[in-house]
Regions:
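Core catalytic lobe of class I
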Residues: 1-216
Length: 216
């Protein structure tokens, strides 16, 4: 078990090919760019609340962000074992007129899209239905990737996971431990190596410790 502080794309260069059993991560959503009702080319404005990070302003141009995330996912596939899985969490950005969807993810071999129902209390807004869901893109490297569903737990019978966000956490957008544990129980064994390139508040590491997995 080890933690690194640095640019994940730089740190991952030192991780050997085909060495990671599972990758679970949620990147910054580039809300720094889309926040403050930024005007779009069609004259409409985005509706997005900025997330504040300690050492990253989360403010790339859409093209820069797309290139960054594609490079990240390419690196994830490089370090992932043929039997491994990636769980990549992302969201839609809303505007007054259209939804900005992370289409770049579809360049990769998605096995399934899991819907994370955060169960937030809806806020009133006159222009759209308040979003309470996020996407978890389950990406598998090959057809030989491991999958082991625990049929005793109803959560694994559906691609909609009803999990409330973590609350006792100072980080702006923390994973709930249950979400990470669902991914681990479905695709890993004890002592497997799990990578979270962004790490955030360290929830992936905590879940790995709870289930006797090794983490980076």
């Amino acid at each position: 078990n080890v933690c690194y502080q640095g640019d994940c794309l730089e740190v991952m260069k030192d991780i050997p090919d085909n060495s990671i059993d599972c990758i679970i991560t949620s990147p910054p959503y580039n809300k720094g760019y889309w926040s403050k009702n930024r005007n779009m080319n069609n004259g409409f404005k985005t509706k997005c609340r900025r997330i504040t990070y300690g050492n990253f302003d989360d403010n790339l141009t859409p093209e820069e962000y797309k290139k960054q995330q594609i490079k990240l996912l390419e690196e994830c596939l490089r370090v992932l074992k043929d039997t491994g899985s990636i769980f990549y969490n992302h969201i839609d950005i809303l505007s007054e007129h259209q939804t900005i969807h992370p289409k770049f993810v579809y360049n990769f071999p998605i096995k399934q899209i899991i819907i994370w129902n955060r169960k937030n209390t809806p806020k009133l807004d006159k222009s759209y239905f308040f979003p309470i869901t996020e996407y978890i893109y389950w990406i598998q490297k090959t057809k030989t990737s491991r999958t082991k569903f625990n049929r005793k737990k109803a959560i694994f019978n559906s691609n909609v996971w009803n999990i409330s966000p973590a609350t006792k956490n100072c980080f702006p957008a923390p994973f709930p431990e249950q979400l990470v544990e669902n991914c681990l129980l479905t695709t890993t064994d004890e002592n497997d190596i799990v990578l979270d390139p962004f790490a955030g508040s360290g929830t992936t590491g905590v879940a790995c410790k709870n289930l006797n997995r090794n983490f980076i």
